[in-house]
Amino acid sequence: VLVHKVGDTLANLTFRLLFDDLGYTNDEIAVYDVGVGFWAFLIGIFVGGLIFGRWGLQRSVLLALVLMAISNLSFAGLAAAGHSNLGLAAAIGFENFASGYGGVVVVAYFSALCNLRFTAAQYALISAAASVIGRVLTGTTAGSLIESIGYVDFYLLTTLAALPGVLLFVFMMRRGLVEESLGSAGRNRS
């Protein structure tokens, strides 16, 4: 999950730049971010809880990683299409749905990795590591990458940057390493 955050964070740092460069007004951004994004986020949380309950931790985390990776493709599509209110609504909606779903499932995963006696401290360290790794590795490179390759290729690159995390999680699942690291938390429905 920590490896996966690089692509996601790289993309998230640049959405506002894309919107500005495509000529969206603050009012347009607010309408779609709040009007569509908020509801898509809530639906993602709800669906994440349902799928987690039915599929268990491992498969629901895998789906979260895939959704969060491919959500960046919607911004590549928006960049290619140009100023499109429908495109903006779709991109923000899909991104927020994936974030809501992923947020629920990843919180459950991080929590399951923690020892019950030290849950707060361990969870804080895992969460901070995920955030810092993504921001330190990507914060200084996003703008220069966009200038050199353009938005479409940039968002395609962020999708590719997330794939090693997805593939590593699949590898760990197949080897039983995810189940082993989770202990009893991941065994009931893997």
Give each language-model segment a name:
Residues V66-H83:
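C-terminal ends and interior cores of transmembrane alpha-helices
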Residues L156-R189:
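Multi-pass alpha-helical transporter architecture, strongest
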Residues I43-S60, I146-E147:
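Helix-to-loop junctions at the C-terminal end of transmembrane segments
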Residues L113, R117-E147:
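A late C-terminal transmembrane helix in Major Facilitator Superfamily
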Residues T140-P164:
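A membrane-interface helix-boundary motif in multi-pass transporters
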Residues V3-N12, G103:
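Conserved extracellular-gate-facing transmembrane-helix segments in secondary transporters
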Residues G100-N115, L125:
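Intracellular juxtamembrane helix-capping segments at the cytosolic ends
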Residues H4, L13-A30:
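Short amphipathic helix-loop junctions that connect adjacent transmembrane helices
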